[in-house]
């Protein structure tokens, strides 16, 4: 794995309750990193929590147990025909009929068989490799700052893509494959809500490697906490002052 060359310490200034997590997809086994405890039986999304709680970075491999659809999405296992037909989602009450569950599978991002054999995880403070995806768990206020760091110098639109199940595909795989920053509300994803992945007011933001340098630099440059966000009175005063000043200045362009 390529050693970390970026200074990502600016993210610490946002005081996240849980540290950002760097994720790396690997064909070959990561060196100088311990495997995930063989006794663990976690879902792919729960490996975020495991990263927060573990003492050191670790990697997950196809020899490890996985309690949900992670191995299927990573191309390590095939989906059972009864599951692929949509039977599970109907029985969970998520979909009216199996057909609706089946139809949405075509939209879920996944890796081809045999491409990914290992996935490395590290909390930001112990990150030593260049991550493929940096995953942030944020409050709504923190999420506003992180997402603004994307559009600050680029004008890029905010976009959120997910599905009611297989939400882990949209925080791990979709950003990596598409090169787009994605954010989701865990409470809107069946498994994440049921497994109590994060606090009720959380937003998960996934930053692919393409965007990490841009957003890091923008966080360093921009004003994180805007005066207008202090309250309605401050917002109206600042906005009104700017409009008045521009109206006056525009008389003599």
Please tell me what each predicted stretch does.
Residues 3-253:
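Acidic, serine/proline-rich low-complexity intrinsically disordered regions
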